[in-house]
Structure formats: structure tokens, C-alpha cells
């Protein structure tokens, strides 16, 4: 299978997945720039200029018992030669221990190697997880709904951090932002390019841990441009009610510039304004959005 056929197969599969998982939280394209590159290369009939692998997440909620609904997240990275080679898929769930998660992923890879090599297989992988997830979860160890609804005592404040960076290009840094936010149950968005913008929101302790990790990476310049701290009553409902973003995803707004690294700030402002954050635009850039 030649490069163009591989790229077209990837895009066709993404279109299929979008129709199978229409909800905003079911299919999340974590790397919008990579998807834009893929579409552009197919349109121009050349693979020149393609630098990033498509990266997305599928969230599947399963009723494993009358009292337990467990969410499994499939983080999927499509190598340039996929589907000739297998995708990189990692399944995660807060309901799995480390050993359970490792075993599930090992068994999934073995299934894909045996049955799907050479064909698109993300949907097959998702169906396999739906069918076999029960085998890896200890139902009795799952927290009760009452315990799930209560926040930890230290998370009595909701925090939203608006982080400014001179630029965000590095693929490892961009992946860290997405994976750390998911690990820490933070929502928001990340806008790569020059300048780079990251917004994370959630429990105060989680936001501070995210910032502690992020600032330790090698940056030309990075700082918290604006911070919001909101006291809560200690319930998860109060925490969730403060969120302005359903997930944390990477956003690309009409990429332009010689290196394709500048975003359309008008679209960024519209995105922020639609979520009640339009006033932050002036704090960031010193001009009113429009």
C-alpha cells in the first residue's frame, strides 16, 4: 500500500469513527494540526509537509453492573504507514489497576496482530474492548456511586490557569499536555504554534501539579498569564458546574504562516467568547477580540 493510499485509508476511517461516535466526548481529536496536515496532503496529492501522526481518543462507557458504569479511553496514534503497520493504541481507565491495564493492553495488541494487520482496525479494537473489558475489572472493588459523588477534602477550590508560551511546536510537549491533563482530570484546551496557549481547569491541587510538571520542561518563555480560583462546597457537582470546557483537546484555528505555525486569533476569540471566556483574550494579547 503506497503512502497516498495509507493516508486516504486513515482519513476514511476517521470519517467512519466520527459517524459512529458523534458525541463531543466520545471521539476527541487530540492533535488537530496532524489532522489538518493529513487532509492537506491528500488534497494536494503529496506527502511532503506531513510531520505529525494523527492522534485521537475514543471514550467508551460500559455498564459493567447495575451500580457501576466504567469509562475506558482508547488513545490512538496512527503511524504514517498505518494500516500497513498496527496503530499505537493504549487503553486506560481509572477503574483498572496498573497490572490490569497492562494485561488488557497486552491482550489487545495480540488480538490486533493476529487478526487486523494490514487493515484499518480502530473500530475492531473498540469493539474488542467493549466485549472483553469485564474480564479485567474487579467489580467489587469499584467505588459506590455515593463515594464517587464526593470530592476529596483538599479539592475545595476550583482553579483555571491561563498559560502563555512563546511557542509550542514540540510534539512530545504537546502530547505531555494532553496526557497530563487526562491523568489529572483537567479540562480546557491547548493551542500550539506561536504563541502557544494552554488553559487547564479543575481541582486546585491538580492544576498546580500540572503547572509544576509543565514549567520543568525546556521553554523559551512560559508563564501563567491569568489565574482563577473559586471556592467550592466540597462536592463533585460544584466542581463540574464551574467547568467551561468538557474535555482538554488541542485546537487549531486556520493555520497559516510560512511554517504553518500561526493561528487565526479571530477564531480563537470566537472560541473563547462562546465559552464565556472572551475577556481573557485582552489579558493575553493586550487587544480587544473581534
UniProtKB/Swiss-Prot annotation:
Signal sequence region: none
Domain RWD: residue ranges: 12-136
Pfam entry (one): RWD
Highest rank taxon of the organism: Eukaryota
PANTHER family: RWD DOMAIN CONTAINING PROTEIN 2 (PTHR15955), RWD DOMAIN-CONTAINING PROTEIN 2B-RELATED (PTHR15955:SF8)
Protein name in UniProt: RWD domain-containing protein 2B
Record organism: Mus musculus (Mouse)
Gene: Rwdd2b
